[in-house]
Amino acid sequence: MRRTHYCGEINIKNVGEKVSLSGWVHRIRHHGGLIFIDLRDRSGIVQLVVDPAISQESYNIADTLGNEWVISVEGKVRKRPEGMENPKIPTGEIEIEVEKINIENPSKPLPFNLWSNKEIDETVRLKYRYLDLRRDKMQSNIIFRHNFILAIRNFLAQNGFIEIETPYLIVSTPEGARDFIIPSRLQPGKFYALPQSPQLFKQILMVSGFDRYFQIARCFRDEDLRADRQPEFTQLDMEMSFVEIEDIFNIIENLFKTTLKNLMNIDITVPFPRITYEEAMNTYGSDKPDLRYDLKISDVTEIFKNLPLEFIRSTLEKNGVIKGIILKNIVPSRREWSIIENKVRELKGKGIMWFTYTDGELKSSISKYLDENTKNKLIENLNLREGDSFFCIAGEWKEVVKILGTLRLEIAELFNIEKKEGLYFLWVTDFPLFEYDEEERRIVAEHHPFTSPKDEDIPLLDTDPLKVKAKCYDLVLNGTELGSGSIRIHKKEIQEKVFNILNITPEDAKKKFGFLLEAFEYGAPPHGGIALGIDRIIAILTKSNSLRDVIAFPKTQSGTCLLTGAPSEVDSKQLEEVHIRVVYPEEKRKEEE
């Protein structure tokens, strides 16, 4: 029985036609001596009517069917009786008068109800992923993902980009997250790594003269997982030669503008807002601020610098700051102030100073230390109005802004502050090129070692590297970092200088990155690019709570696949072939003894 149509495609124009359909039994109803079957495939649902007067054999078969059985049918399209139409589905004006049914495959009783409105245990969903993927939401997510990636490809091809695949088996360069490593059978004792990104290859492609490259790249990182992380993930990887930062911004902004309009009929405004890393931290306490909330950080260091409080004096002596958040039209209760205070302490802060402006008077947890001049300055500078409140904390700059950045979102939840609807894109620029890692006690790259310093800061590489700003940028959407990019270093001497600051010896640099350094000696053009997380973008656009809801076959937070059982042990022969001997941790060894 050869299929002629998809279930969801049939409409009133097909009345009178004979059709052949295949799909899953979505629902069965017996009514008035007839059997009604909702038949489902990827395109939608159509109603079948099985009448014994037309085909007793088909009726007998239909009487044995169960939900999720796979069947094929032949029949005639007819208009539904008046008053029996279903406007909720595209096929609601018609039904199929069944003449023949063929059972392709029965189904066992389902381990969970695919169509329940109740939340389904994710462990069960992942174990029976082939069933979970039949659900409307999952089908919609995966199909939207396909359409989004197709739209990206079309847009970039029209703008002169060439899609080029880069290798999955590469040399290990353990900077940043851990690599997944793969033993070589042909080269005993040597290993490949799976790429954390195609970074080095896309730079090589610019040296090769391809000018504009892109790839829907699979990337791999062996790191501890969270709700927004997967060990294998997909990114839109791009690189362009002879560009400035604004050229890259322009391409990405128009990519989103075109794609969102075509796929979702959403209009977005370009160019996206731009703020520096320092502005983002000072205003929002985060380098990926959620602009849907208006809560901003205010600096009151200057106002409070003469307060006779020991902790303020000692904070300012150490070049600390005093910053806080205004709560417009909110006067917290004692309990609510206590919740905020406890959260600050939980985040390793030293407590809060709070202020409320009610009945024309500024009340505060430190009222006895405030003179009228200080109160008036606070009211005027913060533009406090009747019914407003303010709280602040003192400490080292980075500590204070990070605490307030976390509190900003928790306060929005505590006081039910509504977030604005829509997509709020933002470029964050001018990150530091380096940061000091307290645990490792060394300077590390803020993004990666191939990011170019700003031209005016190049002299600081020799004198004060922690003050060097980078030609890099992050794209943020609704508080989620979609990806990072930068103008790259394309001169060997600057790249070597950066490696030296990062304590990568010339020997290590040659071993790990020698091919790139050598390529720079053969006419490397200025170039830059970006990588955007496809999984994260799709999760936001489909309003999904987890990346696992937009990936067909995701891993759990422990990095396992509940469907296939990966990772698994392998037999000893396979290990011998790649010259590997497994040394178990002590606990595992004891279990096996």
Curated annotation (Swiss-Prot):
Keyword tRNA processing: no
Keywords carried by this UniProt record: Aminoacyl-tRNA synthetase, ATP-binding, Cytoplasm, Ligase, Nucleotide-binding, Protein biosynthesis
GO molecular function list: aspartate-tRNA ligase activity; aspartate-tRNA(Asn) ligase activity; ATP binding; nucleic acid binding
Site note Important for tRNA non-discrimination, residues: 31, 83
Coiled coil stretches, renumbered: none
A Pfam entry, by short name: tRNA_anti-codon
Lineage: superkingdom: Bacteria
Listed Gene3D superfamilies: Bira Bifunctional Protein, Domain 2 (3.30.930.10), GAD-like domain (3.30.1360.30), Nucleic acid-binding proteins (2.40.50.140)
CDD domains assigned: AspRS_core, EcAspRS_like_N
Summary of subunit composition and partner proteins: Homodimer.
NCBIfam families named in the record: aspS_bact (TIGR00459), PRK00476.1 (NF001750)
Name assigned to this protein: Aspartate--tRNA(Asp/Asn) ligase
Naturally occurring in which organism (per UniProt): Dictyoglomus thermophilum (strain ATCC 35947 / DSM 3960 / H-6-12)
